[in-house]
Amino acid sequence: MINIDFDNIEQSQPTLYDTLASDVKFLNTPHFELPPNANPGDFLRETFDHPSAPKALEFAHGTTTLAFVYGGGIIVSVDSKSTQGPYVASRSVKKVIEITPTLLGTMAGGAADCSFWERELGRRCRLYELRNKELISVAAASKILANIVYSYKGYGLSMGTMITGWDKTGPQLYYVDNDGTRLHGQRFSCGSGSTYAYGVLDTGFKWDMNDEEAYELGRRAVYHATHRDAYSGGAINVYHVQKDGWKKISSDDCFKLYQKYYNIVPINKPAN
């Protein structure tokens, strides 16, 4: 009979397998400690929303982002203003997330939610491409993101994003929000200024317009939204997605575009 002294067993050094297993575990889906309520927003309103309580904390979001498909590819146009309620936090926020060299995503809603989950999507897309030795399709990438956010439905995520790119089926554009909604389409606009942007976009859209006309349409649509929407502004960034990937076209300050698009006439100018 063999007697083993378990109290004096020496700790072995971690092997290469243990190290790799630890790395793989680290790369798995991020896990968060969720609140013990099915819907934290409803719980807070039911618990604290009564006449004697101070005004409840309101998470107000504002932005203008749009994307559309035309004959020459896909145009993505966004503003760069970030607000915290009535306070302007920044005028130089990057609202286009460069997921992969062939995929772009936009952010509207909570900046942290959009940025974190779209970067997580980029990690998963790169792993897919390494394992399968082919580019991931836009449909698959958008489905991955929709499945991720759906698992957190009701837990306070705030996200409205457009996933766009060019794959084997051609230019593709999808809309995904924090409820797991996933829509495929040709033209989308998201954010508090989207109503104004849609008006300009739908009026000026032509499938066979050239690239410069498409850039100008995306720029004008977001600009007019920033002119009327208090929560949009800063610079207007325009991207062009083509078969060989995406490229950034321009970044124009809204104040300079105001001088370009509006012919300001003095009030006291005599009539002709």
Swiss-Prot record:
Localization in the cell: Cytoplasm; Nucleus
Question: Which terms in the Gene Ontology molecular function aspect does this entry carry?
Answer: endopeptidase activity; threonine-type endopeptidase activity
Pro-peptide positions on chain: 1-62
- Which cysteines pair up through disulfides? They are none
Catalytic reactions on record? Cleavage of peptide bonds with very broad specificity
Q: What is its EC number?
A: 3.4.25.1
Database matches in Pfam families: Proteasome
Provide this UniProt record's keywords sorted from A to Z: Cytoplasm, Hydrolase, Nucleus, Protease, Proteasome, Threonine protease, Zymogen
One GO process term, biological-process aspect: proteasomal protein catabolic process
Q: Which InterPro entries match?
A: Ntn_hydrolases_N (IPR029055), Pept_T1A_subB (IPR000243), Proteasome_sua/b (IPR001353), Proteasome_suB-type (IPR023333)
Q: Which residues participate directly in catalysis?
A: T63 (nucleophile)
- Principal localization reads cytoplasm
Q: Which family does it belong to?
A: Belongs to the peptidase T1B family.
Q: What does this protein do?
A: The proteasome is a multicatalytic proteinase complex which is characterized by its ability to cleave peptides with Arg, Phe, Tyr, Leu, and Glu adjacent to the leaving group at neutral or slightly basic pH. The proteasome has an ATP-dependent proteolytic activity.
Oligomeric and partner information: The 26S proteasome consists of a 20S proteasome core and two 19S regulatory subunits. The 20S proteasome core is composed of 28 subunits that are arranged in four stacked rings, resulting in a barrel-shaped structure. The two end rings are each formed by seven alpha subunits, and the two central rings are each formed by seven beta subunits. The catalytic chamber with the active sites is on the inside of the barrel.
Protein name (Swiss-Prot/TrEMBL) = Proteasome subunit beta type-5
Origin species? Dictyostelium discoideum (Social amoeba)
